[in-house]
Amino acid sequence: RAILGAEGNRVQGLIAPGHVCTVMGYREYEELSAEYGIPIVVAGFEPLDLLAATLMLARQLEQGRARLENQYSRSVTRDGNPAARRLMDEVFETADRKWRGIGRLPLSGLRMRASYDEQNAEVRFETAVEPVDEPAECISAMVLRGRAKPTDCPAFGGRCTPSNPMGAPMVSTEGACAAYYHFRRSESGGES
């Protein structure tokens, strides 16, 4: 909601993460689709899953439709995995969290309940995770919000690579910057 409701939002559709929806279901995504009038497709992570989800999303956009579709029905149901949800509810509670490129959002993350303090590394080892700011030239916050492409970044592919990442989207192999880096094509049409 922080991204979809932001001024200047350009997100036209979402591919929802199948691994999350396998546990949590997709009810919340149905609500987002209706609230913001955008198509959302739940997808698995195999290449054919992603291609099929992209096609489903494109068809909805072309037809002016906005609803949730479940491409990953072999694993995801509307209600997810009730046993896993009960276990998560037993161990975790919602908490305010800071999100890269967005800031602190109330009740947007999870923390272990006090009854699990004995297993909670933050409590047991009295750790304090200090926030690390990205370098000023890193535009990962804009990439994460869908306001810029990885290739718009002056550090992309030079000072910022998967082996020397400057921001979160280059760290993870699932990140937009890392994906662009690994699958980019040169201007002449060949691999770079």
Predicted feature residues:
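Cysteine-cluster motifs in flexible loop/terminal segments that predominantly coordinate metals
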Residues: 129-185
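A conserved active-site cap/scaffold subdomain adjacent to cofactor or substrate pockets
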Residues: 9-77
